[in-house]
Amino acid sequence: MSAKPQPIAAANWKCNGTTASIEKLVQVFNEHTISHDVQCVVAPTFVHIPLVQAKLRNPKYVISAENAIAKSGAFTGEVSMPILKDIGVHWVILGHSERRTYYGETDEIVAQKVSEACKQGFMVIACIGETLQQREANQTAKVVLSQTSAIAAKLTKDAWNQVVLAYEPVWAIGTGKVATPEQAQEVHLLLRKWVSENIGTDVAAKLRILYGGSVNAANAATLYAKPDINGFLVGGASLKPEFRDIIDATR
């Protein structure tokens, strides 16, 4: 197999953090010497982005938003892509299962957002994944490929340079259940094959596919050893110093 593309270790803080806890954690990140080629991403709440921008000094990191809408205007409570760009944020997580589950974001809505973000120059971490019911009904492939094809339908081939896929089995998020490295690799390989056949072998070779779902310091290295796992989208463990060990696991 050809060499893996540059890995990504992404911290999705979700709706968590206080000024004090974030300052403490960012200090830990700043003091962490990372000696290999890896893109670290941290996604704080919108409110905490300026704090992290002011305090984070580790050059391996970029700051991401956890969500965004396409345009500014009369959308109370939302934050738009132009506003994020204006404050210097150029990465965004879109389609996280919590957005899909709690806020009714359909495959179509997520695909439209990913397309808009690419057009506006963002790097996008686009999330896909199946529920426990879907996995038990043997629908994993059908679900993740329909989510991926919805996104692909709205993207030019060039736009894939700005897209990172994150496979997050919904049944493994925050539950302590983790897909086995074999289960995760099976889905990652399926996704890469689909991209290879439908978008291009060149795109598939460069595409970073992250795993998300109860990733921690204990399981990260075993997961990363699989050929089609290119890093992680980390929830709970990214709020702890343990995130350093997950970054180190992507060597």
From Swiss-Prot:
Q: Cite the Pfam families for this sequence.
A: TIM
- EC no. given is 5.3.1.1
Q: In which pathway does it act?
A: Carbohydrate biosynthesis; gluconeogenesis; Carbohydrate degradation; glycolysis; D-glyceraldehyde 3-phosphate from glycerone phosphate: step 1/1
The record's PROSITE patterns line, in alphabetical order, gives: TIM_1, TIM_2
| Catalytic EC class | isomerase
Top-level lineage group: Eukaryota
Query: One GO term of the cellular component aspect?
Result: cytosol
Compartment(s)? Cytoplasm; Glycosome
> Would the keyword Isomerase be found if you checked this record's keyword annotation?
yes
Q: Which family does it belong to?
A: Belongs to the triosephosphate isomerase family.
Q: What is this protein called?
A: Triosephosphate isomerase
The protein's organism comes out as Leishmania mexicana
